[in-house]
Swiss-Prot record:
GO terms for cellular component: extracellular space. It is found in: Secreted. It comes from Sus scrofa (Pig). One of its GO terms (molecular function) is lipopolysaccharide binding. This is Antibacterial peptide PMAP-23. Disulfide bonds join C85-C96, C107-C124.
Amino acid sequence: METQRASLCLGRWSLWLLLLGLVVPSASAQALSYREAVLRAVDRLNEQSSEANLYRLLELDQPPKADEDPGTPKPVSFTVKETVCPRPTRQPPELCDFKENGRVKQCVGTVTLKEIRGNFDITCNQLQSVRIIDLLWRVRRPQKPKFVTVWVR
């Protein structure tokens, strides 16, 4: 009788462990990679944009140090560039060519890697193009001193 109870108890524990094993992998499968989270942020940027063309990821800065919790907001920094695809086409931006002399924006903010929540807090600012002539003028132009130190004996 005692062995039947022990066997029944062991069977229940085995069932619980099996169920737990099925649940844990599905939870970890819902975490996005850093790049996937940024690509979703770019998609959200395109959805909310009022500009004529889609933007596509141009450059992604290094991901932050590993953090085990996918629900913790991660800092991101990336650059997007305007493509030739009009926004209403709803074509994936990855399939669009970059527009020659298209706008470039630097984006910073935070993303969460949890697929369910997928929170994004991103701000993008257009980068100013600098002509080489302007840059050379700034470098060669003599700088006026802002202050002078005079030593008196």
